[in-house]
Amino acid sequence: MNPLHATVLGAIQGLTEVLPVSSSAHLILIPWLFGWPESGITFDVALHLGTLIALALYFRRDIAELVVNALSGLTGGAHSSATRLPWYIIAGCVPAAIVGKTLEEPIEAIFRANPAIIAAFLIGFGLLLALADTLGSKKSRMDQIDLKNAMMIGLAQCLALLPGVSRSGITITAALFLGFSRETAARFSFLLSLPIVAGAALLKVGHLVRHGVPEGELQPLLIGVGVSAVFGYVSVALLLKLVQRYSLYPFVWYRLLAGAGVLLFIFNQ
């Protein structure tokens, strides 16, 4: 992989892993559209690490607070929504961890080579996001999340294995349907994604440690980490500011246009 491809794909990963537009769809469709070779698992590691760095840096205070609250609850401190939230996040990650470990490879094998289905998922789940943003009451706050809410959002996260769905998109959609505000939905979505992204990164780092970095891949790998981290950090900040003032319809329209554009490209080939 050359440095230009690494930069473009790093930027795409950083932006689309966080925004509700599906990083997996973009990382499959962009190389397919331009005829680029597949990036491979080494570069996959770089992209996941970059995203993890961005999320960990942006939510460093939230993470520290979650750890303190979890320990407080374990050591006899007063039980509250704050001390329970870390455990709700962990519980919400369990379904996606199990499904991901079991089905990630067969799902990727089925859908990676089918851009039309990916485009259909972009459109279909974009419409679902629009419906949630329109019908959701948007009243509930972070301190009102309970185990049932966390598990329902966590179950929805399992659908993110399908390229074109979007991890942040489907969890924000589920949270909106459950009545949470846009900001709470987005923030909880990111906190819920941290253990999953970290787990995926660690699994792929393990593969990298066992097999080593292929010759000539170190520079693109480092570029991928850095670029995806920078763009990921910026896009988290951007999304959290946007949802405080505006609807999620700009992302819905983007998904519809991107999906329709891919379908038109396929049918005109």
UniProtKB/Swiss-Prot annotation:
Catalyzes the dephosphorylation of undecaprenyl diphosphate (UPP). Confers resistance to bacitracin. The chain crosses the membrane at residues 40-59, 87-107, 116-136, 160-180, 188-208, 220-240, 247-267. Its EC number is 3.6.1.27. GO terms for molecular function: undecaprenyl-diphosphatase activity. Keywords: Antibiotic resistance, Cell inner membrane, Cell membrane, Cell shape, Cell wall biogenesis/degradation, Hydrolase, Membrane, Peptidoglycan synthesis, Transmembrane, Transmembrane helix. The gene is uppP. This is Undecaprenyl-diphosphatase. Bacitracin is thought to be involved in the inhibition of peptidoglycan synthesis by sequestering undecaprenyl diphosphate, thereby reducing the pool of lipid carrier available. Its main location: membrane. It is found in: Cell inner membrane. GO terms for cellular component: plasma membrane. GO terms for biological process: cell wall organization; peptidoglycan biosynthetic process; regulation of cell shape; response to antibiotic.
